[in-house]
């Protein structure tokens, strides 16, 4: 496999080296190799343009969504990525901040109660989907004495649509289309829906409508006329069956 230059964006340099090494090991064990593997945080933020231009793969790391969002704004990452042609991979908070508007789901104690906590922030605009990762791990969690999803996130979903992703699922986008691979759910207008079941129901309804429309334009297939020999053979068969019944 071709070796690539990879560049990983981190917001807390205390963890940069640790997470970067773990990420590098995961890719290596999956058959990917990199010529260079560099991180970007506040220590080398001035080198951002050079690092991004050299990279072929950009990984948006995890962390605290609002904190990461501030860092991305500070280094004007949206503009840096807009003028480049890179493979971009987002993990956890990185995938969330990849949307046009990120839903910064309350995570730390006190955030859901803080009137100054901003739950919707302008982000990178890589995807249109608002992602909520790790759903299988956090769907039953409580925060500030309330159910994280049922009493906080569901309310915030009014007029919006959040796509939950279990670990192992991912969203793929090419600039035109976005496709979710794996089991996921949509939280919208305080309701939870299974994405696949919704897609299957919609597809079935669409196919039925197409069939009805086609019947209006497609002429029925005429029955094939029988030859004289076929008619005689058919008559003989019926007569034979009739005589057989009389004998019995």
Where in the sequence are the language-model features?
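N-terminal beta1-alpha1 cap of cysteine-dependent amidohydrolase-like domains
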Residues: 1-57
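Short, well-ordered alpha-helix to beta-strand connector turns
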Residues: 55, 84-85, 127
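C-terminal and late-domain segments of enzyme folds
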Residues: 1-2, 8-10, 14-21, 104, ...
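P-loop/Walker A phosphate-binding loop and immediately adjacent motor/lid segment at beta-alpha junctions
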Residues: 75-87, 158-161
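Short glycine-rich anion-binding loops that position phosphate/pyrophosphate groups of nucleotides
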Residues: 63-65, 93-94, 136
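Catalytic nucleophile loop
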Residues: 59, 82-101
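Short, active-site-adjacent cap segments at secondary-structure transitions
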Residues: 66, 95-98, 170-172
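Glycine/threonine-rich flexible loop motifs
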Residues: 65-74
């Amino acid at each position: 496999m071709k070796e690539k230059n990879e560049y990983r964006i981190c917001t807390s340099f205390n963890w940069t080296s640790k997470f970067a090494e773990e990420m590098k090991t995961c890719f290596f064990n999956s058959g990917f190799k990199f010529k260079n593997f560099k991180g970007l945080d506040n220590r080398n933020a001035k080198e951002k343009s050079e690092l991004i231009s050299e990279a072929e793969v950009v990984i948006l790391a995890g962390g605290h969504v609002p904190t990461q969002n501030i860092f991305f704004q500070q280094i004007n990452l949206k503009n840096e990525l807009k003028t480049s042609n890179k493979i971009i991979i987002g993990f956890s908070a990185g995938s969330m901040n990849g949307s046009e508007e990120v839903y910064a789901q309350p995570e730390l104690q006190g955030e859901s109660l803080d009137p100054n906590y901003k739950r919707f922030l302008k982000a990178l605009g890589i995807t249109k989907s608002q992602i909520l990762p790790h759903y299988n791990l956090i769907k039953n969690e409580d925060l500030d004495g309330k159910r994280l999803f049922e009493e906080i996130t569901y309310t915030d979903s009014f007029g919006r649509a959040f796509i939950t992703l279990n670990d192992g699922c991912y969203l793929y986008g090419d600039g035109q289309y976005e496709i979710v691979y794996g089991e996921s759910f949509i939280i919208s207008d305080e309701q939870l829906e299974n994405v696949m079941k919704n897609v299957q129901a919609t597809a079935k309804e669409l196919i039925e409508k197409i069939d009805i429309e086609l019947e209006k334009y497609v002429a029925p297939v005429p029955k094939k006329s029988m030859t004289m020999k076929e008619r005689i053979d058919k008559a003989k068969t019926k007569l034979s069956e009739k005589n057989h019944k009389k004998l019995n």
